[in-house]
Amino acid sequence: MKAALDNFRDAIYSPGEIAHISDTELQQFAENCVVALAVGGEGSRLKAATESQQTHKTALRLPNGDSMAGRTIRMFRDAGFRDFVALVFHHAQSVIDVLGDGSHLGVRIAYSHDPERPVGRGGAIRNALDNGSIPRTKNLIVHNPDDQIIRYEGSFPRDIVAGHLLGVQRGMLATAVVVDGTPYTYTGMKIDHGVVEQIEMYPYIPIPTHVGVTVFSPKAYDYFTKLFDLTKKVDFESVLFPLLAQERRLYSFMIPGRCWLSVNDPKALARLIELAQKE
């Protein structure tokens, strides 16, 4: 089974070049970039924890006093990024209460509120472009803070910027950060003419998977204006990614699967708490 999955991986993925940037290049990019925190979603599978505290899941206080949003901001801050915008709707005030204006973290945080109704990540970015909290002249990194980067060796922001700039040199407008696959959550079987020949517990399925982090160049903003409005809830991944892929203008940067934790249920939250206590 593993050999078959390896062949499948080779058929759908080939890596790009290894990218490197200088300290000066990183600083220049960071100074001309806004990091958008997508913190407007409801987080229904963690509703028991969030509703009891009237708190957005990315603002939940971990036992060490931290939050998912705070961890994400510090990761980018330590790489030189200073300008952030939180795209808020559900339990917006809880996010504002935790993050404030960012001064206690050494950064600047603006807020862009979804207009009256949730509009998804596509609409939220369109709204932030319209209200000026994402300047159209600046680069943009969109990070969903419930997609936590953990156990990463080196600087995650530096590496994704290096990968993005390599893609820009090839005419790309955006870079999707991915892992090389995800564990299958069930018992896998190899079957021949009805006979089970092999069992693989929780096999690793080698399909490149987006980790909720995307880097955009300013030239991508016209797509948000054309594709999204503020009348319905739409995430940009389902609409914009296929179009950019068709045009061959979407690049990728791959990180190890062990460095991504999608915190969307109580089990994943408990895992984050465990890992955070070891840092």
How should these model regions be labeled?
Residues K2-I96:
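N-terminal glycine-rich phosphate-binding loop and ensuing alpha1 helix
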Residues N32-V34, R82-F84, R108, N139, ...:
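Residues at the starts of beta-strands that form the adenosine-phosphate
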Residues I96-D97, H104-G188, T225:
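Conserved beta-loop-beta/alpha segment of the NTase-like Rossmann-fold superfamily
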Residues L46, V95-L99, F224, L272:
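Hydrophobic packing residues within well-ordered alpha-helices of enzyme cores
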Residues N64, H90-H91, E116, R258, ...:
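Short beta->alpha linker loops
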Residues I141, Q148, E153-Q169, G181-P183, ...:
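Catalytic-core segments of class I nucleotidyltransferases/pyrophosphorylases
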